[in-house]
Amino acid sequence: MLDVRGSLPGQVNTGTISPYRRIDRSNDTIGTSDLAADEQVLLGPFNHLDARPGKEIRSQLIDAFDSWLQVPTASLAVIKNVVRMLHNASLLIDDIQDNSELRRGAPAAHHAFGTAQTINSANYVYFRALRELSTLHNPVMVQIYTAELLNLHHGQGMDLFWRETGTCPTESRYLEMVGNKTGGLFRLAIRCMCVEGSPKQSSADYIRLATMIGILFQILDDFRNLTDGSYTSSKGFCEDLTEGKFSFPIVHAIRSNPGDSFLHDILRQHTDDPAVKKEAVSYLERCGSLIYTQGVIHQLAGDVLTLADEVDAGQGRAQALKDIVQRLMVKL
């Protein structure tokens, strides 16, 4: 084995290095004879999810923003790949924290590979994504990556805290959480694109637009989780109720009826019973929370389209983004 006795910091005494594992100083990696096999193990849970693509909304949004930002092709490919890796890795952790059964119509990765291996795979991909981003050779990228991963975990941490303690947030606190959690990866992509591209407007305008889109996307997801039958096959029927999640419609209903513990009681059960879930949805309808949520979604979508025109400033390049927003609003 490697003998480090008597060495100073930064120095290693010469000694015997195991023939089974050699340190490659050229790229700070540890090479093994079966590295490819190791990678299959390490990436197994990630690949399980990555092989089942989602809606690819983030990739489409990156392309839409690129109409304005004109990022070099090679840099754009790196940013897209980093966002894809981070998104799927974060879903691996989300599914564990939410005890989800399904993801994209298949068993969640931790049910196939185990919780410990899935956590390790997600963390491994976080650092692979950082390594990928560093190939752009711009230290600002690492600062952006760090800031937005902190924001993502801040938002996720508050979401989990409210769920685990049965604390219903205010609407404003919920929107702040979503801006951190869901807006984080949208912002990471757009901030990196602003650095690599040629923005015609202030970077802050593009970033604000990205945050608004993230909030719109999450509230749409909250609404459809409770109302859209297509979610049943991919994620399960009204899964947010089983998770005990304070989603946007539920926050509105509880805050509108502070003396009624009905929804609190259902969330605490983490029920899988379809009949109980249907009764909860009926309660949301009676409270007007689903209609209220629809109204907020339409208002947000309008705000996004208005800001997109302001950012575009007459360039005629906003249509791709508008098309995405309009597709998101279908069947609402």
Curated annotation (Swiss-Prot):
Q: Which residues bind isopentenyl diphosphate?
A: 55, 58, 87, 104
The record's comment on cofactor binding reads: Binds 3 Mg(2+) ions per subunit.
Its BP terms in the Gene Ontology are: alcohol biosynthetic process; isoprenoid biosynthetic process; mycotoxin biosynthetic process
Q: Where on this chain does Mg(2+) 3 bind?
A: 221
Q: Which residues are Mg(2+) 1-binding?
A: 94, 98
Kindly list any coiled-coil regions of this protein.
none
Q: Enumerate the cofactors the protein uses.
A: Mg(2+)
Sites annotated Important for determining product chain length: 126
Q: Which GO terms describe its molecular function?
A: (2E,6E)-farnesyl diphosphate synthase activity; dimethylallyltranstransferase activity; geranylgeranyl diphosphate synthase activity; metal ion binding
Q: What is this protein called?
A: Geranylgeranyl pyrophosphate synthase 2
